[in-house]
Amino acid sequence: MSQNSLRLVEDKSVDKSKALEAALSQIERSFGKGSIMKLGSNENVVEIETISTGSLGLDIALGVGGLPRGRIIEIYGPESSGKTTLALQTIAEAQKKGGICAFVDAEHALDPVYARKLGVDLQNLLISQPDTGEQALEITDTLVRSGAVDVLVVDSVAALTPRAEIEGEMGDSLPGLQARLMSQALRKLTASISKSNTMVIFINQIRMKIGVMFGSPETTTGGNALKFYASVRLDIRRIGAVKEREEVIGNQTRVKVVKNKMAPPFKQVEFDIMYGEGVSKTGELVDLGVKAGIVEKSGAWFSYNSQRLGQGRENAKTFLRDNPDLAREIELSLRQNAGLIADRFLQNGGPDPDDGDGDATAEM
C-alpha cells in the first residue's frame, strides 16, 4: 500500500514538471524568449544599480547606496525645501559617471546658473518645457522607450496641466482630470522604465486636505497613482537656517524616506543645503562622523585620529574643505560603517500616522 502511494506522488511530480515545461515553452512561443524565466537564472536581476543623490547620509539612509535605476522616484515637500536641488544633484552625479540626463521643466522655472553651480553639465543636459501635461508625459515616454536616458526628472507633477484645462475657461471645474492623466501615464510608463533601466524622478508639491480632524492634513497632487507606482518616496523639509554671523547662507534640511521598496523605510537624515553650492559634503562628514564614532567631539572641539579639525562645526567644515585627502579618508570610513549609521537613522525616523498617503480627492 505504501509503495503504491509513493509511486502516485512521484507520478504527480513528474506530471507537474512536464506540464510546467509545456506551459513555459508555449509562453515563449507566444511572447518571445525571455518573457518568463526563473529569477535566479539571471544574475543581473539580483543586482540593484543605483545613482548617488549627492548626499552621503541620504545614500546610506536609502539602504542601497543611492536611488535605484529602472524605478519611479517621488520627491515631495513644501515650497523652497530643496526638492529641485536634490534632483539636480542626482543629475550631476549621474553625469559624472557618463550618464545621459533629461529635465522636463513643466514649471518653466529651471535656473541654469544655479544648476551649473550644483555641478550639472548644461551642454549635455536635455531640457523640455512642454505646454501641456499630455505633451510632458508623451516626451517622457518617448525618452524612456529610447533606452538611452539614465535619469529623467519631471518638475513638477502639480504643473502637469491637462490640455482640457488649458483650453477651457478660467474657473472651470474639472475634478479628477489630472489624477486620471497621471494614472494612465504611469500604467503606460512603468514597464518601459523597468526595461530601459531609466530612473524617473517626479517632483511633487503639497496640498492641504479640507476638513481633516485627525492625522496629517497634507497630501500630494496628482491623485494616488504615483504613491503606488513609486519605489522610493522622499519627504524633504526645511527645518532651519544656516547662518554666518547674521547672514543666512543655507538651509538645514531633513529628508525622510517615507516609502522604500529596496530597503527598510522610515529612515531620516539631516544635512545642510548651502546657497549656490548644494548639499554641504563637509558638513555631512562632520555630522555622520560623530554619529558613527569616527569623528570625536569633546566640548566644542572636533578631532579625527587625535588630529584637531577645529573648534565648532563651521571651523571643522572649513578644515575638511581645505584638506580633501583627510575628507576622503573620513568618507571611506563612513561608507565602511554604513550599516551602523543606517540603524541609527532608523531610530530617529518612524512611520507617521499619515505620511501624505491619504485621499487626494479634496485638495485646496
Curated annotation (Swiss-Prot):
Highest rank taxon of the organism: Bacteria
Keyword DNA damage found: yes
Any one Gene Ontology molecular-function term assigned to this protein's record: ATP-dependent DNA damage sensor activity
Primary site of residence: cytoplasm
Compartment(s) of residence: Cytoplasm
Pfam families with a match to the protein in the record: RecA, RecA_C
GO biological process terms held by the UniProt record: DNA recombination; DNA repair; SOS response
Region ranges (Disordered): 343-364
PROSITE patterns: RECA_1, RECA_2, RECA_3
Positions of ATP binding: G77, P78, E79, S80, S81, G82, K83, T84
Xref: CDD domains: RecA
GO annotation, cellular component aspect: cytosol
Keywords: ATP-binding, Cytoplasm, DNA damage, DNA recombination, DNA repair, DNA-binding, Nucleotide-binding, SOS response
Biased composition, class Acidic residues, residue ranges: 352-364
InterPro entries per the UniProt record, alphabetical: AAA+_ATPase, DNA_recomb/repair_RecA, DNA_recomb/repair_RecA_CS, P-loop_NTPase, RecA-like_C, RecA-like_N, RecA_ATP-bd, RecA_C_sf
NCBIfam families cross-referenced by the UniProt entry: tigrfam_recA
PANTHER family: MITOCHONDRIAL DNA REPAIR PROTEIN RECA HOMOLOG-RELATED, RECA
Family note: Belongs to the RecA family.
Function: Can catalyze the hydrolysis of ATP in the presence of single-stranded DNA, the ATP-dependent uptake of single-stranded DNA by duplex DNA, and the ATP-dependent hybridization of homologous single-stranded DNAs. It interacts with LexA causing its activation and leading to its autocatalytic cleavage.
Protein known as: Protein RecA
The gene coding this protein: recA
